[in-house]
């Protein structure tokens, strides 16, 4: 059961060489950089813990979800795919996570693709919402399209062809 710090930084360290310092021919873990980044992610995503050395498995499900998000964000992807990013997270933290994802898109140009069963959450942050019905893309709607359009699309009764936003 690895610490919160290791859960957040390990993938980026292994795949991108982040948090490593070169000493001669060796590359060693830069503990100060890793610790600083992990602490920043804990603060940014409001991960409720006793500290970054706490085992991630000891956290609540919602806080474990935020650690997973922190790990993905540490990789600094151009495109971030997240599935149910607010599942198990308390209401206040849901807003924080969604606003942070929107901020990454707005300020860093990161494309964020969210798969979610929470339509109201999607409508609060997305600029386009693709509706999948019977395994096919039924339509693409704008967040401010009518509830009736969303209802028809989600029920599989959409007859208007693709409504691309």
Where in the sequence are the language-model features?
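A short, surface-exposed alpha-helical micro-motif characterized by mixed small hydrophobic
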Residues: 122-124
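Conserved H-loop
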Residues: 109-115
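A short, proline-enriched helix->beta-strand linker immediately N-terminal to the Walker B motif
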Residues: 74-78, 84
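Conserved P-loop NTPase catalytic core
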Residues: 1-59, 141-143, 147-159
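ABC-family nucleotide-binding domains
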Residues: 83, 90
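Short, glycine/charged-rich "phosphate-handling" switch motifs in NTP-dependent
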Residues: 128, 140
